[in-house]
From Swiss-Prot:
Single GO MF descriptor: structural constituent of ribosome
Note on domains (UniProt): The N-terminal domain interacts with the head of the 30S subunit; the C-terminal domain interacts with the body and contacts protein S4. The interaction surface between S4 and S5 is involved in control of translational fidelity.
Pfam families, per database record: Ribosomal_S5, Ribosomal_S5_C
Gene Ontology CC: small ribosomal subunit
GO biological process: translation
Matches recorded under Gene3D superfamilies: 3.30.160.20, 3.30.230.10
Protein name: Small ribosomal subunit protein uS5
Keywords: Ribonucleoprotein, Ribosomal protein, RNA-binding, rRNA-binding
Length: 166
């Protein structure tokens, strides 16, 4: 998989989750923050990243930098995905199903952010297993990265597209 250059893309970012952890010390409590950020150009490129810092804006900035390093290309066929797929990450599973034009993005919280920034307009999803936002985002991106168009499958199998589509 080749690396995608984030500097040439017009990326939008969305903060999906901000977590606060507390370390109790003799002098009181120390707070640190983690931010889960999704970036995408709404045209087939999407990535997620985690940033951790003592202040929320710093954590978000680090998350955006990390997300830009983890961009993937998503094959989009007529505003939806080419085929059904289940993405897994840890205990989180996300079922992604193609949908007819006009359906819209039927997805819960963290999954919706990933799909909208990927540029997918019509899709049905179901979260199975863990509802942890971090696992759901990673599972969605893992599922999207496994998608292949009919042309790619035909090339891999040395067949024509008509033979693949039946």
């Amino acid at each position: 998989m080749q690396r995608i250059d984030a500097s040439v893309l017009d990326l939008k970012e969305k903060v999906v989750n901000i977590g606060r952890v507390t370390k109790v010390v003799k002098g009181g409590r120390n707070f640190r923050f983690s931010a889960l950020v999704v970036v995408g150009d709404e045209n087939g490129h999407v990535g997620s990243g985690m940033g951790k810092a003592a202040e929320i804006p710093d954590a978000i900035r680090k998350g955006i930098e990390d997300a830009k390093k983890n961009l993937i290309k998503v094959p989009i066929v007529n505003t939806t995905i080419p085929h059904e797929v289940i993405g897994e990450f840890g205990a989180g599973k996300v079922l992604l199903k193609p949908a007819q034009p006009g359906t819209g993005v039927i997805a819960g919280g963290p999954v919706r952010a990933v799909l909208e920034l990927a540029g997918i307009k019509d899709i049905r999803t179901k979260s199975l297993g863990s509802n942890n936002p971090i696992n759901m985002v990673h599972a969605t991106i893992e599922g999207l990265s496994r998608l292949k168009t009919a042309e790619e499958v035909a090339k891999l199998r040395n067949k024509t597209v008509e033979e693949i589509l039946g």
